[in-house]
Amino acid sequence: MSFIPNTEAEALSALFSRRSVLGATAAGGLLATPLAAFAQSGAASGPGEAEITVDQARQEPIPIVVPNFGAGLGEQISGVITSDLNGTGLFKVMSGSVPPGSTPDFSALKAQGARAAVAGQAVGAGSVRVEMRLWDVLSGQQLQGTAYTASNSNWRRIAHIIADVIYERMLGEKGYFDTRIAYIARTGPRHHQITRLALMDQDGANERMLTGGEWLTLTPRFNPVRDQIAFMSYANNRPRVYLFDLASGRQQILGEFAGISFAPRFSPTGGSVVLSATRGGGSDIFVVDLASRAKRQITNSNGAIDTSPCFSPDGSQIVFNSDRGGSPQLYIMSASGGAAKRISYGSGQYGSPVWSPRGDLIAFTRIGSGGFSLGVMNPDGTGERILTQGFTVDGATFCPNGRVLAFCRQSASGAGGAGFASGIGTIDITGFNERPIRISTGASDPAWSPRNG
């Protein structure tokens, strides 16, 4: 019996002979221009005195003043910045007035308890120019000064970019707000759902349906270097992996396999895809080169089910799920093939592994004691920690800096799970700050994009 993500299990269980376990910045028309620091305050070359260590689970959030950037659009921009920063649990956004064209009153800001402050304004009609300055209240230094110009329709992206700048200057590593999440939008009753490939901003805004819902669609995965998504579709009643080009809207079959192909993930270079394909009574893992479409088999399951492969960030290894030892567990092997080493030894059944972009953790789903758990472990299998639990928690995906996971949470209430619901939430790698992403449909199978270029 093999463990695959819950949505894959629903689709594939009827096809397998044995039932699966359920389970700064210039792009996109946006221009960034540096703003000089005021003469009395030199620009700092690194994070200010408010720098903290993000790995500390209960670190006190940084108090930061983010005023309105003006009426109308300016107020909306500051609202998104505030939501982004507060959502991390690492910042405490405070109201206040910081004049955009002069040095802040640091004494007043210190008395308010602020450690950092933002000054900004948004002006324009058909296009918007947003100026922002970030100040370290404790040192009196300007940490950042930038002006952004874009069409009015891009105002949310400006806000996310400003939040990323604040995050990076205060914490010393890049933020993840100017990103997107691909997912499966779900509508209709539980056993007759319409599934669509969909895309949204990481905060749930700008929902966009990419496919029409004619066929069952599952497991989207972002290419790390281009606007391309791999996913599984039952188009024409043949379950196969497809590639979707976001710029053109075109989709194409990744490759022909004798059986079902599923569970795709891109290599770190974006030049190949690792996936599972059925063979006889089991499934094996293959790597498909995108340029030549050549296929290379890297496992020989001998009737077991090897699935859910994921590359390490350097592309040298693959973590995957297999029932070759009798129960679904996690294994690591060289990306070129060879022997596999088991890394999961806790109680229960393991699946849905995904490697952190930092290389330090592997996230997973574990089934045991009558429920689902979402956790992380070191790549050698040590240091296992459970982050959250529930009726079903599955499909973890890391944000680009590796500090936050998005995942699918399914719930059931009433007799027979009559109140079944599926949605996407986020949680940080310390196990704190779990938050739902509010969108207009049911949702599953999240896949976090790289940073927008």
UniProtKB/Swiss-Prot annotation:
Tagged with keyword Methyltransferase: no
Family: Belongs to the TolB family.
Signal peptide (from-to): 1-39
Protein name as it appears in the record: Tol-Pal system protein TolB
Coiled coil: none
Subcellular location, record wording: Periplasm
Main location as per UniProt: periplasm
Organism: Gluconobacter oxydans (strain 621H) (Gluconobacter suboxydans)
SUPFAM superfamilies registered for this protein in UniProt: TolB, N-terminal domain, Tricorn protease N-terminal domain
Function (record text): Part of the Tol-Pal system, which plays a role in outer membrane invagination during cell division and is important for maintaining outer membrane integrity.
UniProt keyword annotations, A-Z: Cell cycle, Cell division, Periplasm, Signal
Subunit structure comment from the entry: The Tol-Pal system is composed of five core proteins: the inner membrane proteins TolA, TolQ and TolR, the periplasmic protein TolB and the outer membrane protein Pal. They form a network linking the inner and outer membranes and the peptidoglycan layer.
GO cellular component terms given for this protein: periplasmic space
NCBIfam families linked to this entry: propeller_TolB
Ribosomal protein among keywords: no
GO biological process, one term: cell division
